[in-house]
C-alpha cells in the first residue's frame, strides 16, 4: 500500500461509505477508486482531488494533509496552493519573492 492509498481507504471508511458509493459521489468508477487505494494508479487530477475533499467533507487540517500527501507522491505543488496562486496572477510574484529569499538565505 502507499501513503495516499492508505489515507484514502481510512477516510472512506471513517465516512461509512462503500467503495461504490464513494466512487459514485466523486464521479469515477469503483475500479478506479480501488486502483487508487492499492497504489496501482497515481493520485488523481486536481479536479478529482477537489471532489474527494467535498465528498469526504474534510476540515482544513485534513485538506492540507490530503493535498500534501498527493503533492509528495506526484512531485507536484499541493492543489490548494496551486489553485490559490493560479486564481491571482499578483500572487505569482509574491511566491517568487518568497522563493528567492529562501535561495538567498541558503547561500
Language-model regions: role of each:
Residues 62-100:
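Short, charged recognition helix plus adjacent turn
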Residues 21-23:
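Short alpha-helical "recognition helix" segments of helix-turn-helix
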Residues 1-17, 96-98:
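A short, Lys/Arg-rich alpha-helix, primarily the initiator
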Amino acid at each position: 500500500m502507499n501513503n495516499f492509498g492508505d489515507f484514502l481507504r481510512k477516510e472512506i471508511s471513517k465516512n461509512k461509505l462503500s467503495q461504490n458509493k464513494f466512487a459514485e459521489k466523486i464521479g469515477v468508477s469503483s475500479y478506479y477508486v480501488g486502483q487508487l487505494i492499492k497504489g496501482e494508479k497515481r493520485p488523481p487530477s486536481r479536479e478529482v482531488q477537489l471532489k474527494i475533499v467535498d465528498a469526504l467533507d474534510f476540515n482544513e487540517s485534513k485538506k492540507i494533509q490530503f493535498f500534501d500527501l498527493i503533492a509528495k507522491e506526484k512531485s507536484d505543488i499541493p492543489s490548494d496552493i496551486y489553485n490559490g496562486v493560479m486564481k491571482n496572477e499578483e500572487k505569482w510574484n509574491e511566491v517568487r519573492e518568497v522563493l528567492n529569499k529562501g535561495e538567498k538565505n541558503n547561500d
